[in-house]
Amino acid sequence: MISFAEGLLYGILEEAFPGDLAHCIGDTSEIEVHLEKAINDFKIETFDSIKSGIKEIGIIVQAIPSLLKDCKIEENDLKKLAEMAVIFTHPLTLALRVGKNILVNGVDIYDKISKGLTLYQSADYNGSGRQFGMALAEVFLKTSS
């Protein structure tokens, strides 16, 4: 799942991770559990299942900073991850932010989620992570109108 994590970071941070995650990232079993749940949610393709899948990917985002503790990561990138992770600790804020950005601000993440799912099913985990990361960045890092 290192490849997925690299892709997810790339999608969120809009740049490749500087270095080799395989040599500095910790145990990825938590990522694997939540990723499988997210993939199953995304396959259902309803608004609620997409929200649930985003929540599962968010749990992965919350876990990433502790997994990266031995990695060299820029302060600004860590700040983006922390900002996004905080939202996932407040379920009401999460639901409001996702709903508002998808419905009010017109954030269209369906194509990214769909492409991420297709890439995951074809074992392109890096590409899949990148698509999910870009979808998260659209929802959580997009400036509200």
Protein language model regions, located:
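Mature extracellular/luminal domains of secreted and GPI-anchored eukaryotic proteins, especially small
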Residues: M1-S145
